[in-house]
């Protein structure tokens, strides 16, 4: 029995399912989840001392690679001064100033402790600002586990009140309308019918929770136009894309300005952090300035601010994101070439330093249906073959992958060699 198998059995005694977040359980790919004990640069090391090139990156935050020396030094320095004060600090102001300078749409920002808190708070703020109850989200887009966002799409143009988790009251979920991602016509039709009741549209500008689906040409522009037309707040959920697809996030990458944005992952440099912000007029509704309440004991805690500030400063150097995007492109091109040579139907998607892998014969992946039509069973086999080859991919066919600045030519060769063997075995 491996050390991971032993630890997983032990974990299940007191942790539901043996994990503290469901995707970690490997249910989508089968087998025993790996337990890691160390991470450095582009690598993670499991409890049996096997090293893997890591394309999960703690689900996105580790854009500098694991254990960057300057980030660790910043955290160690803060440790000498205490863990948390529950009071304002100079670093919070410095962080707010930096975030607002990097993301032009952010005129004011509020720190929280997770991406879920950020999206939950942004939606409450949009409702308070507009005085409306309904929200629109899209198929396959995940915005955290707050009740109003755990709603899935059904068939037809518009689905109301279909909770995708037990414990979400139907009366609460009925205010969430779910539309097809990349379908601006559905948005136009819905807003024409019920636009006066809609507080906000929340969208992942790149859908990173059905692997990696970039916006179709005109989709984000259409959302901006329709929100302006109907007085609806446009929220970009950049928890995943923020500071990754470009320094200014997806909104900078695609040139679209939302009213509110949510961030997480990279903004904390590996610590539990989220933030939300946007137009000063809207943010002025948040307590203590306005009537929309939001609070948090550990919001803006100094350890997280130290890690996040250092990370954002390091990734702000000229050329950083170009290097990341170039590596990601070379890796995906290499995978595609090897899949084609093996005769395996395969397609990739990319937005900066995030990517998607699909076992599909489609020319492109644009919709939720395209994603669901891909061969998840073949991905399972590919995942384990790559794992055997020393490459750790996201353990789900529906999660995006991430690269870091620590990935280089050596890691690229390991990845492509493992993929060549894997594709040959998948014939």
Swiss-Prot record:
Q: Which UniProt keywords apply?
A: Cytoplasm, Isomerase, Porphyrin biosynthesis, Pyridoxal phosphate
Q: Where in the cell is it found?
A: Cytoplasm
Cofactor section: pyridoxal 5'-phosphate
InterPro entries on file: 4pyrrol_synth_GluAld_NH2Trfase (IPR004639), Aminotrans_3 (IPR005814), Aminotrans_3_PPA_site (IPR049704), PyrdxlP-dep_Trfase (IPR015424), PyrdxlP-dep_Trfase_major (IPR015421), PyrdxlP-dep_Trfase_small (IPR015422)
Pathway the protein takes part in: Porphyrin-containing compound metabolism; protoporphyrin-IX biosynthesis; 5-aminolevulinate from L-glutamyl-tRNA(Glu): step 2/2
- Report the top EC class in one word: isomerase
Catalytic reaction equation(s) = (S)-4-amino-5-oxopentanoate = 5-aminolevulinate
Its GO CC terms are:
cytoplasm
Q: Per the UniProt entry, what are the Gene Ontology biological process annotations, in alphabetical order? A: protoporphyrinogen IX biosynthetic process
Top-level taxonomic group? Bacteria
Q: Which residues carry this modification: N6-(pyridoxal phosphate)lysine?
A: 265
Q: GO molecular function terms here? A: glutamate-1-semialdehyde 2,1-aminomutase activity; pyridoxal phosphate binding; transaminase activity
User: Where this protein primarily resides, as one coarse class?
Assistant: cytoplasm
Q: What is its EC number?
A: 5.4.3.8
* Recorded family membership: Belongs to the class-III pyridoxal-phosphate-dependent aminotransferase family. HemL subfamily.
Report quaternary structure and partners.
Homodimer.
According to UniProt, the name of this protein is Glutamate-1-semialdehyde 2,1-aminomutase
Q: Which organism is it from?
A: Pseudomonas putida (strain W619)
Q: Supply the gene name.
A: hemL
